[in-house]
Curated annotation (Swiss-Prot):
HAMAP family in the cross-refs: NDH1_NuoN_1
Protein name per the record: NADH-quinone oxidoreductase subunit N
Membrane-traversing stretches: 8-28, 35-55, 78-98, 104-124, 125-145, 159-179, 203-223, 235-255, 271-291, 297-317, 328-348, 376-396, 409-428, 451-471
InterPro entries listed in its UniProt record: NADH-Q_OxRdtase_suN/2, ND/Mrp_TM
GO MF annotation: an example: NADH:ubiquinone reductase (non-electrogenic) activity
Annotated source species: Yersinia pestis bv. Antiqua (strain Angola)
GO cellular component, one term: plasma membrane
Gene, per the UniProt record: nuoN
Family designation: Belongs to the complex I subunit 2 family.
Reactions catalysed: a quinone + NADH + 5 H(+)(in) = a quinol + NAD(+) + 4 H(+)(out)
Length: 487
């Protein structure tokens, strides 16, 4: 098979990030320099982001049988790269105080980003599995990066063991689907799995096992038990990546699989997804109420947010594609910037590394009185995650409710409204604590010039985008409408 220049251009983000991995690896081997390796990482990711402009010029195409590059993959590739950039930026000041090797952190983030980019373009079960493993394996190292702390090491081992079990379920599910359909490509699966085949036991068993494997990666109920422990144990910049890039990439590929393979037209599959969605929304929100650890709280809230998104997967079968696709694009963009801001504030408060992160809610008590702008940013992020009007989070929730109503998914829409009402309590609890009287002695605090650091700039840009796109969302909606898959 000969690769044309157009195909090479279509693969530019993947190639640039892959090349950056090699350059950073050689740089570490030549000389350990934290600043140089961080700079190389950020330059590589920025070039990958800029290359999306040229990818758009060559038009949608199947680059290989495993990869399909179109507007859909470009949009989610952009989101994954932005999340990876933010993670690297937050990691730099955190690693300044880290006593061991710092440079490998960037290498692991780049490899995980490579897996995420592959997932957004995956058009085949082989590339889906390869992308998930490429994304997941570096996370074992990243979660346990602060290995001198027992909790970080425990989180890494817990994630590794459960992830291995989930991958085996996913692989076995794929094998059952292949045994029945004779194809591994999404399009081939869609063509061979006709309506009559959907109800065959092997197909349903295969789909069920894939839902188990993917449900773990997306931390959906009942496969979510690892989430709060891992979010709490992982360093704050790694929790940022876990909450954003890994969830966005995996959800993007799941959505593409559901669009091409109508095997999910099965009433049984739709019922299972609906139950998982409602359980995730209620469990995530109810468990977050009692949390005093902000990373655990955001971990539980991410379970609820993925539950809201799962409604779009159910609606794909009952609705034309346009609205579910728009909903997922707008919601994930809002979730990305809100999470980057929230975890960014936690990362800034936890930098430089001094052992445990600033994760207790008590650490943020009275933040407004000595860091008013930072507390304003955190307030905006909490309001956006709660879905309050004038924020981007509200636009995403509005799309989810509108889609649920138009698809006649009344009880799922009711779950969204109920979940949002519960969520409002604990998001406002975090917000109120920022404005209480501060403690006598500060446990952790950000540097006085935090807004001039790269991490501070990322947090401020996220807050501005959440507000501006919350008031005037049309540019984002237009971008999402352009990001349509090549059918």
């Amino acid at each position: 098979m000969t690769i044309t220049p157009q195909q090479l251009i279509a693969m530019l983000p993947l190639l640039i990030v892959g090349l950056t991995v090699v350059v950073v690896m050689l740089s570490i081997a030549w000389r350990r320099d934290h600043f140089i390796n961080a700079t190389l990482t950020v330059i590589g990711l920025n070039l990958a982001l800029l290359s999306l402009y040229f990818v758009g010029q060559v038009g949608p195409m199947d680059v290989t049988p495993l990869m399909r590059v179109d507007g859909y993959s470009m949009f989610y590739t952009g989101l994954v790269i932005i999340a990876s950039l933010a993670t690297s930026t937050f990691a730099y000041p955190w690693l300044v105080g880290y006593p061991d090797n710092r440079e490998e952190f960037y290498l692991l983030v780049l490899i995980a980003a490579l897996g995420g980019i592959l997932l957004t373009s995956a058009n085949h079960l082989a590339s889906l599995f390869l992308g998930i493993e490429l994304l997941t394996l570096p996370l074992f190292g990243l979660i346990g990066y602060a290995y001198r702390q027992k909790r970080s090491l425990e989180a890494s081992i817990k994630y590794m063991l459960l992830s291995a079990a989930a991958s085996s379920f996913l692989l076995f599910g794929m094998a059952l689907l292949y045994a029945e359909s004779g194809s591994l490509s999404f399009v081939g699966l869609g063509q061979s799995l006709s309506d009559s085949m959907v109800h065959q036991p092997l197909i349903l068993a295969g789909l069920g096992m894939m839902i188990v494997g993917l449900g773990f990666k997306l931390s959906l109920v009942p496969f979510q038990l690892w989430t709060p422990d891992v979010y709490q144990g992982a360093p704050a910049p790694v929790s940022t990546f876990l909450a954003t890039a890994s969830k966005i990439a995996i959800f993007a590929v799941v959505m593409r699989l559901f669009m091409y393979a109508p095997a999910a037209d099965s009433e049984a599959v739709r019922l299972v997804l609906s139950i998982i969605a409602v359980a995730s929304i209620l469990f995530g929100n109810l468990m977050a109420i009692s949390q005093t650890n902000i990373k655990r709280l955001l971990g539980y809230s991410s379970i609820a947010h993925l539950g809201y998104l799962l409604i779009a997967l159910v609606a794909v079968q009952t609705h034309e594609l346009a609205l579910p696709l728009e909903t997922i694009g707008v919601y994930l963009a809002g979730y990305l910037f809100s999470s980057l801001g929230a975890f960014g504030v936690v990362s800034l408060m936890s930098s430089p590394y001094k052992g445990p992160d600033a994760e207790s809610l008590f650490s943020y008590r009275g933040l407004f009185w000595h860091k008013p702008i930072l507390s304003a940013v955190m307030t905006v992020m909490m309001l956006s995650l709660a879905g309050i009007p004038m924020t981007l989070g509200f636009i995403g929730k509005f799309f989810v409710v509108a889609m649920g109503v138009s698809a006649n998914l009344w009880w799922l829409t009711g779950a969204v409204v109920l979940g949002s009402a519960i969520g409002l309590y604990y998001y406002l609890r975090v917000t109120v604590s920022l404005f209480l009287s501060p403690p006598q002695s500060l446990v952790r605090d950000t540097p006085s010039n935090w807004a001039l650091t790269a991490g501070g700039v990322v947090v401020l840009i996220s807050a501005i985008l959440v507000l501006v796109l919350g008031i005037y969302p049309q540019p984002l909606i237009t971008l999402v409408q352009m990001a349509q898959p090549l059918m």
